[in-house]
Amino acid sequence: AREMSGMYRCQTSQYNGFNVKPREALVQLIVQYPPAVEPAFLEIRQGQDRSVTMSCRVLRAYPIRVLTYEWRLGNKLLRTGQFDSQEYTEYPVKSLSNENYGVYNCSIINEAGAGRCSFLVTGKAYAPEFYYDTYNPVWQNRHRVYSYSLQWTQMNPDAVDRIVAYRLGIRQAGQQRWWEQEIKINGNIQKGELITYNLTELIKPEAYEVRLTPLTKFGEGDSTIRVIKYSAPVNPHLREFHCGFEDGNICLFTQDDTDNFDWTKQSTATRNTKYTPNTGPNADRSGSKEGFYMYIETSRPRLEGEKARLLSPVFSIAPKNPYGPTNTAYCFSFFYHMYGQHIGVLNVYLRLKGQTTIENPLWSSSGNKGQRWNEAHVNIYPITSFQLIFEGIRGPGIEGDIAIDDVSIAEGECAKQDLATKNSVDGAVGILVHIWLFPIIVLISILSPRR
């Protein structure tokens, strides 16, 4: 190895117990090694009729003198030469065409071998980037089919030739066959521009895989794939929502598949006669024994710390003033009942929908609150479609039933007296959730017209 280069000292030692005359010699070891170069590999994307210059630099080599270089495109020799005092060699292409796209290799050679720089020069367009925060993407809701508003931006649209079209591929989840069509593009795509295409005649409630490939005069660019799913719109233009859990589908609330057990719909009139005493409500929030509510049953076999999570439907919202300092405010309120000596914890989360799902702690309360219904009010400021999650955590014993009722969402902030009294009287912790969207690209995306 080249690290072994250097001066070595050799000395005599005793021979069969006899002293010998001390002698020593110095030996210099010189290890020759081929040139180390950079870049080892570099991709260059450039449009036709444009120029490009590639540069291969020597980092170290031994011997450093009498270095030669060769530039090749594939197997075709382009240029050879010898280094003088410079530490790099360049190869320019004045005007790119189909004939001079490809892999360029620069070999720098000495007596010990060669180092190589490789350059992939291509006219391929970069992959598009799907936009996952489309407001109300299920824009048509017919009986058996639905339509989906697909949106995306183009990464570095000016890096190569103008994108003239996109090849759209779509297939139903679980199927093998792709259906393809071309989406024509008129004019130049600007960086950050939001492009929209409506997918129609999609079968409810099937999910679909979508593939998008940009096309230029060079040919196909890089593809990107996403999955779209049908979700029944609830209050697509959210103004007010109220759920007392009286209807059969419990207002489209659903159980979380990742928890330990489920919430249960119940009324006092229909509950099991073997219910655990000294815990749980005696009536719904209105005082009716026939009225329903949702609760967690903490009797055996439930264990301390186990969780039950109840998910609200997805609410779609549209920012009213994307240039303003705030998002639209909503007042989220609900009634909760936490009575029993073994009460655990009731948490509420705000889940924002997007490319990555984010859950923000919104409200929390724990411990025995007495045999009564309590009310909570919290301001929320969602920036995109959202869900609310009720999480009940089992306490140390069976007398730990937790119930909720009359969940409401109304546009506008909660009254100050509600926030001041309802959230503090029982020791609950209310958290105002302010989530701001900083990147200017999102503001541009929201305002960009559909193509």
Swiss-Prot record:
PROSITE patterns: FN3, IG_LIKE, MAM_2. The keyword Nucleotidyltransferase does not apply. SUPFAM superfamilies: Concanavalin A-like lectins/glucanases, Fibronectin type III, Immunoglobulin. Disulfide bonds join 56-106. One of its GO terms (cellular component) is plasma membrane. It is found in: Cell membrane. Residues 241-416 form the MAM domain. Glycans are attached at residues 105, 198. It is a lipid-anchor; GPI-anchor. Residues 35-122 form the Ig-like domain. The keyword Membrane applies. A lipid is attached at residue 426 (GPI-anchor amidated aspartate). InterPro entries: ConA-like_dom_sf, FN3_dom, FN3_sf, Ig-like_dom, Ig-like_dom_sf, Ig-like_fold, MAM_dom, MAM_domain-containing. Residues 427-451 form a propeptide. Pfam families: MAM. Gene3D superfamilies: 2.60.120.200, Immunoglobulins. May be involved in cell-cell interactions. Interacts (through the Ig-like domains) with NLGN2. This is MAM domain-containing glycosylphosphatidylinositol anchor protein 2. It comes from Macaca fascicularis (Crab-eating macaque).
